[in-house]
């Protein structure tokens, strides 16, 4: 980070959250001069809400960011104090790495990575206006009257645009607790005539870990064989800890129920829509009234920090009500609240106003990334920041833009969802959103995206060398597997039961029979067992899904062909048990007349379309039989 001494840059990034840090680093890796504006340098990389990175779908995004040499995965590996691979018992395609992080270590890691990045200048100051000329952005103006010129501007405002913090019936302006909102810039953006709306998110009260009865709680350790995020790392760097698990109860629920009218959300003080898949404790008790208890994870916020994050009870109830209901929870009877939970409401813009590069259609040179586009979550924000930063730098260099495809990355799925379908509620990533998820595994993100990074020039020499070594080993292993074949009798001798059909099967094809088959192949193919475990694991996953991926591609093509099929106006979605309640309500409200229209609904998934098609075809057959 250098002292601010120039007033012209190639790219200006506004905001130092997860999207802004990733955008600034990505653009600078492309060799352009970047200025990152933030209200406080000490706030760069702050984890404003939960102290965790990754998860289902989200962990895939972190791996993709890392594959393009982004910073989130490396910072999470440095700061991670508990690593868990979610969905470990399910197929590799939907397994998601997650790490609970030490807030201080994560923030310091991000700041250190930014400081080491050539071409990146971090500047403290509030951007209050955009310099525009001839329908293109030309730079920004600061609150102190300074003008800074730049050919491209990336806005990553998070929850700061007209942000309002709510605790019960109390409300005050704020971008997050302790920070002022961005109101002047919000007014300037309002003059662009872009479609905009209000969203909200929330956070739970922070607890004093010294007042928790830890000995009375169930403890959850991390994985014994932790899976880290960066392809450059092999193991966590920080000391690992366990988290506590407790539950709400009938007393908790009654206190919340009795005070619903005092909640900012249920008291009518908030107009913004909250995240469906991260509901407040008020939402849980209203929407899931039949549930007797809700799980709460007690996550220490750091190795040297007594603050505990109670994951699962975010709220906008008054502070005294929060204290009352929290103390009904087992293990928290004497707990002290260090900071009350709160809801925050903020402006966002319809992402359909953006090109797939995340450039604003109505104003050339201006890019949006993160929560300003209607997403929720650190990982979704960081991934958008990466895409915006790379594309802004490519544009400055007058090179072809980078378009991430749905078939090649979760990043491509997210950007396509946002720019083609828009959002009416905070968007978060799930593996179910990707029609090609069998080939978009977390473990092969480098094989999918690092070659793109090499072509762009955004990947370090160290990563290039590491990637090339891994690719050579994968090619060697694949050749060994494809070059070896077995008769049914030989496979039976190895402990793999197949029909005696006389067909020889390559060792790669045998991988489709699962883990035991992969172990047997390691014994039966000369030289294969000498390959590193990581390489053999990835090849086993490639083989496991090979046939399914072909079927996946055929199903995606079939869906494309079936887009013209009509859906009756009175079609009943309620009996489709495979549809989420979210999609049922959206389908019944929108009443799409064709499969193509249904496909454009926000939150629609390929599996949901397949269910609708199957029901339509069954109805057609039944009608023909009458």
From Swiss-Prot:
Positions that bind FAD: 15-20, 127, 182, 371
Locations listed in the record: Cytoplasm
Pfam families, per the entry: GIDA (PF01134), GIDA_C_1st (PF21680), SAM_GIDA_C (PF13932)
InterPro entries: FAD/NAD-bd_sf, GIDA_C_N, MnmG, MnmG-rel, MnmG-rel_CS, MnmG_C, MnmG_C_subdom, MnmG_C_subdom_sf
Protein keywords: Cytoplasm, FAD, Flavoprotein, NAD, tRNA processing
Cofactor(s) it depends on: FAD
Gene Ontology CC entries for this record: cytosol
Molecular-function GO term, any one: flavin adenine dinucleotide binding
Gene3D superfamilies listed in its UniProt record: FAD/NAD(P)-binding domain (3.50.50.60), GidA associated domain, C-terminal subdomain (1.10.150.570)
Free-text function comment from the UniProt entry: NAD-binding protein involved in the addition of a carboxymethylaminomethyl (cmnm) group at the wobble position (U34) of certain tRNAs, forming tRNA-cmnm(5)s(2)U34.
Binding partners and assembly: Homodimer. Heterotetramer of two MnmE and two MnmG subunits.
Family under the similarity heading: Belongs to the MnmG family.
Alphabetized NCBIfam families for the sequence: mnmG_gidA
Protein name listed in UniProt: tRNA uridine 5-carboxymethylaminomethyl modification enzyme MnmG
Biological source species: Cereibacter sphaeroides (strain ATCC 17023 / DSM 158 / JCM 6121 / CCUG 31486 / LMG 2827 / NBRC 12203 / NCIMB 8253 / ATH 2.4.1.)
């Amino acid at each position: 980070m250098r002292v601010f001494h120039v007033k012209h840059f190639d790219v200006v990034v506004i905001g130092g959250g997860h999207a802004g840090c990733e955008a600034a680093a990505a653009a600078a890796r492309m060799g352009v001069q970047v200025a990152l504006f933030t209200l406080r340098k000490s706030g760069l990389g702050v984890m404003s809400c939960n102290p965790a990175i990754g998860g289902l779908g989200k962990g895939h995004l972190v791996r993709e960011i890392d594959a393009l040499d982004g910073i989130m995965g490396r910072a999470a590996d440095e700061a991670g104090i508990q690593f868990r691979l979610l969905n470990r018992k399910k197929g590799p395609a939907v397994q998601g790495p997650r790490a609970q992080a030490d807030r201080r270590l994560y923030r310091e890691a991000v700041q250190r990575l930014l400081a080491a990045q050539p071409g990146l200048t971090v500047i403290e100051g509030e951007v209050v206006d955009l310099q525009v000329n001839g329908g293109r952005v030309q730079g920004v103006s600061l609150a102190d009257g300074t003008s800074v010129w730049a050919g491209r501007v990336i806005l990553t405002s998070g929850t700061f645009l007209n942000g309002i913090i709510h605790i019960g019936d109390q409300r005050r302006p704020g971008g997050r607790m302790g920070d002022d909102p961005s109101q002047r810039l919000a007014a300037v953006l309002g003059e662009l005539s872009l479609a905009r709306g209000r969203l909200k998110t929330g956070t739970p009260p922070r607890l004093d870990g010294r007042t928790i009865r830890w000995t009375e709680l169930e403890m959850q350790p991390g994985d014994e064989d932790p899976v880290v995020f960066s392809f450059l790392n092999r193991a966590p760097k920080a000391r690992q800890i366990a988290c506590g698990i407790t539950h709400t109860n009938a007393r908790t629920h009654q206190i919340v129920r009795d005070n619903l009218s005092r909640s900012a959300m249920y008291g009518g003080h908030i107009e913004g829509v909250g995240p469906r898949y991260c509901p407040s404790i008020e939402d849980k008790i209203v929407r899931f009234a039949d549930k007797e208890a809700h799980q709460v994870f007690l996550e220490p916020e750091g190795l040297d920090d007594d603050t505990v994050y109670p994951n699962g009870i975010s709220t906008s109830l008054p502070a005294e009500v929060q204290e009352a209901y929290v103390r009904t929870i087992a293990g928290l009877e004497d707990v002290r609240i260090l900071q009350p939970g709160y809801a925050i409401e903020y402006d966002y813009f319809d992402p359909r106003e953006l090109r797939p590069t995340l450039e604003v259609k109505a104003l050339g040179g201006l890019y949006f990334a993160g929560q300003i586009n209607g997403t929720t979550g650190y990982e979704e924000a960081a991934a958008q920041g990466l895409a915006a930063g790379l594309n802004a730098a490519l544009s400055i260099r007058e090179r072809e833009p980078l378009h991430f495809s749905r078939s090649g990355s979760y990043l491509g799925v997210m950007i396509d969802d946002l720019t083609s379908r828009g959002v009416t509620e905070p968007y978060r990533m799930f593996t179910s959103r990707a029609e090609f998820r069998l080939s978009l595994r977390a473990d092969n993100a480098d094989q999918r995206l690092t070659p793109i990074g090499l072509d762009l020039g955004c990947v370090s020499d160290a990563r290039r060398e590491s990637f090339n070594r891994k690719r050579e080993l994968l090619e060697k292993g694949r050749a060994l597997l494809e070059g070896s074949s077995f008769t049914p009798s030989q496979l039976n001798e190895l402990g793999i039961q197949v029909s005696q059909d006389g067909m020889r099967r390559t060792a790669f094809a045998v991988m489709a029979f699962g883990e035991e088959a992969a172990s047997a192949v390691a014994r039966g193919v000369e030289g294969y067992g000498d390959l590193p475990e990581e390489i053999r694991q990835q090849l086993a996953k490639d083989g496991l899904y090979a046939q399914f991926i072909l079927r996946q591609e055929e199903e995606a093509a079939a869906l494309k062909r079936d887009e013209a099929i009509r859906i009756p106006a009175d079609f009943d979605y309620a009996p489709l048990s495979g549809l989420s309640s979210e999609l049922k309500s959206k389908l019944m409200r929108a009443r799409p007349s064709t499969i193509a229209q249904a496909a454009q609904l926000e939150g629609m998934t390929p599996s949901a379309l397949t269910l609708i098609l199957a029901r339509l075809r069954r109805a057609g057959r039944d009608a023909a039989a009458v």
